[in-house]
Amino acid sequence: MKTRFRHLALAQVFASLLITAFADVQPQQQELNGARVNVSAMELEVSTGVISRKWKWTGAGWATTSLRDLVSKREYAKETGLACDWRLPGKLDDKSVGELADCVIRESDDDGFSSKHLEVVSTVNYPKVGMAIQHVVWVYPGAPGVRTQVRVKALPGYDAKGAVPHDEQYKYCGGKLFRPGARTDFLPLDLSKPNSRRYWGIYNDPGNRLDQSKPMLEEKIITGFPVFQPEVIAWASGEVVEYGDVGVIVVKESAKAVNQPAHLTGGFFSGQQGVEVTGWGLAPEEIVPDRFRECWATWSIVYGGGNDGMQMALKKFDAARYPVFPERDAFILSNTWGPANPGGMRYTAEETVMKEIPALAEIGVEVLQIDDGWQKAGDGHCAKNFLPKYKNGWKDIKALADKHGIRLGLWVAIRNADLNDLKKNIDELGFVSWKADFDYLANRGDYEARIANYRTILKHAWMKTQFTLCPEYDAPRYGWYFAKEYGSIYFQNIQEAEPPHLTFVPYHVLRQHWFMAKYFPSNKLQVMLQNPKRTRKDFSDASRHGHGYCFAMGIPFVPCFFQLAQYLDDDGKKELKPLISAYKKDRADIFTSTTFPIGDEPSNASWTGFQMVSTQTAGTGHLLLFREMHNAQPKGSVQLKFLAGKTLSLTNLLTGEKSTVAVSAYGKAEFEISTPADYRLLRYEAQ
């Protein structure tokens, strides 16, 4: 009896501590277009209308108790013994005593850089270790996921010694094992039930991944359950726990790439308790007393409908987190570095630029981006003084560009840029699309400084400037799920001739675009489109393809005409002008669509392509189909997305020809392209 009373007394003391720690936080509720946040009775619950997530206050912090798909009514969370979703070994764990100082709910759009959402910020103080944590949740109305993040600040008495931010490898009985480091989020998913785990990541340094042996996408599916020992994956940006055709997606909003971990991006630890996401992106010595500093965020997303539904849910959430702005981002860009052999600075000469402007206007390209060489001093990573080298500054170039309806873009070695110079260029030109190159982001301070600069520039000329962030080379930069609100991500340098390993090979390019479209939004990827008739023949079969075929590879993306229009022959102009014109008529729909790879993986002998599912009109979209050069079948059966059992009304955007096609109950439809190395761009409407 004494033992029982002692346990009751301890429970009462613990409960009183919880209430005391929660005492200053008043019950509150707020809604936004169907999204809802509720704080009450020591619980935090958020709902987008599609997904809900619930936490309980444990005295150590917020611990997830529910993750629910509101469409299927399926609950994914299980009971665990964990007391807090975040952790810093050596400082914060389940036994830490936290004080919930406040919980604030507000509407936000992140200063215009994200979609409207409810933001919930809970501030938890840990006086014993001299730390304060802000637990941040972004709740987007109608989205299939929520975003969580930890921010950290030092309080009096904080000492960085003893904290372990990184995942530690250790040896035990001949084995190399890992201990999880700083934890950013935890999902109590039941991995004892039938499930598989799908991991994916995208490589850094895309310019050196052109050939068929180096796909941009790394994907691994692990089967077998229960998961008894922790499954540790350090290279991936995303994990999907698949329970048959439904499941949960977890994404690191970080600078991680498969071959470049960047700053403390951690990994996924999946085991008996659930899925643990590590990597604060903040070293113990970077925790400071004057402000909260952000850690890498995490997306938790629910889905149904198998891998197609998984891709759709991921891209829907990505579009909420990183919306596109067609008035800012939808254009056909050209870049003067395209004919580089291997250098391209000579194509920034004023004479070349003045000749290029009317040539671009003739075929319908809208933005001329002047690459490395326009600035007054240096080149490459040593470039500086980013003001025009030209005799009359921008006066003559701007006058000719205005005459032909061409806007301008500029290359910049972003680490060396003076913000006032960038602003001056924007003010004089009226619009600038920047290519941000040669970055190197080694620590949290580097990321904070660069992001602050991007925001300053974009706010200076709202919707009149944007950045394409370049991940070329192997330096730690941005990854693929971070910093996309400032424009797009530059893809691969692809050249006519030099250096040889960058030579344009059509099926290589199409293949990488196809891989990227699986888990990355196509309207955030700027792709290079080279001149097939000028490409060297000893390393490529590009010359056996038409200009239209090669340009069409970029239609689902942000197309960059990586060549000079003044070098086009008459046949090239005749081929490109009608294609570009047809594309522009439907661009508003294409650019805002959700894109999926369809058909077979490009191999130079496949039926392959892309399906662009309209976000503007249900049941409609576009198909871009390729019959590759060595494919001997004029008719191809292509697996489509979300159209099983439908009849499609088709319109050929180039010819205006109309037709219909029946989609089987399994989602397949047959198309015809009579000649190899040809393509079709079709608008569809499902009946």
Regions found by a protein language model. Give the residues of each.
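Bacterial N-terminal signal peptides
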Residues: A9-T20
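N-terminal carbohydrate-binding accessory modules
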Residues: G34, I301-R328
